[in-house]
Structure formats: structure tokens, C-alpha cells
A protein has these predicted regions:
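Short glycine-rich, flexible loops that bind phosphorylated cofactors or substrates
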Residues: 69, 97-99
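Glycine-rich phosphate-binding loop signature in dinucleotide/nucleotide-binding domains
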Residues: 81-88
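A short helix->loop->beta-strand "cap" motif at the edges of active sites that frequently abuts
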Residues: 105-110
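Short amphipathic alpha-helical segments
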Residues: 52-53, 99-104
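N-terminal strand-loop element at the rim of the active site
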Residues: 10-18, 22-73
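Short His-centered aromatic/hydrophobic patch
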Residues: 91-97, 114
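Extreme N-terminal starter segment of soluble prokaryotic enzymes
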Residues: 4-8
Length: 114
């Protein structure tokens, strides 16, 4: 019997590759692909997009995302993504907007790291 993979969405608002971005790339390179189905939500113009795709990890690139404390447009777009993707976990990297959108979309587990 095949075990269902846990769906995890990581959300980064950074356009450059900083500390969180480097950590995420390391994680994506070595995570267990048999147990975890991982996707990453990024601003469409982030330098991270190509780096994540090079690791054969799906990217959901958003035009609406800004790197600020609360972003109404991004909130609506993220909630829509979370409802469509139905992740088991949303892991945000310092984004209050993503945490609030995940809660609105009733994501079971929401983690945040800075």
C-alpha cells in the first residue's frame, strides 16, 4: 500500500536569496521526496524562482506578493492558493500575510520561522 505524501507549502516573500532562502534551498535539496510533496510560493520576480526550479521543486509564482507586514492583495491570492492546493502544512518565513491567509483557508498546521 502506498502511503500518502504530506503536502507542504513554503512561502517566502524575499526577492533576493538571503538566510531563509539559503536554508530553504538546502532543505529542498535534501528533503525526503517519498514522504513529502513540497511546493514553494514566491514573488514572480524573486531570484529564488530559478534556484528552486533547478531542484525540480514546483514553484507557485505570485505577482501580487510584496515583502511587507500585511498585503491585502497577497492575502486574497494566498488564501485562494491554499484552498486549491489543500496543504497539510504551510511554512512561512516571516510573512504575517501568509500566516493569516493559511488560517483563513483552514490549513491544519501553520509554521513560521524568521
Amino acid at each position: 500500500m502506498t502511503e500518502k505524501r504530506m503536502k507542504i507549502l513554503h512561502v517566502l516573500t524575499d526577492r533576493n536569496i538571503g538566510g531563509a532562502g539559503r536554508w530553504l534551498l538546502y532543505y529542498l535539496k535534501y528533503h525526503n521526496r517519498e514522504k513529502f510533496a513540497v511546493k514553494v510560493v514566491l514573488p514572480h520576480d524573486s531570484l529564488q524562482v530559478a534556484a528552486v526550479q533547478a531542484l525540480d521543486v514546483p514553484v507557485l509564482a505570485m505577482e501580487e506578493m510584496e515583502d511587507k507586514s500585511f498585503d491585502r492583495k497577497a492575502f486574497k491570492a494566498l488564501a485562494k492558493i491554499f484552498r486549491a492546493e489543500r496543504p497539510d502544512i504551510v511554512h512561512t518565513h516571516a510573512s504575517m500575510t501568509a500566516r493569516m491567509a493559511a488560517r483563513r483557508a483552514r490549513v491544519p498546521y501553520i509554521f513560521n520561522t524568521k
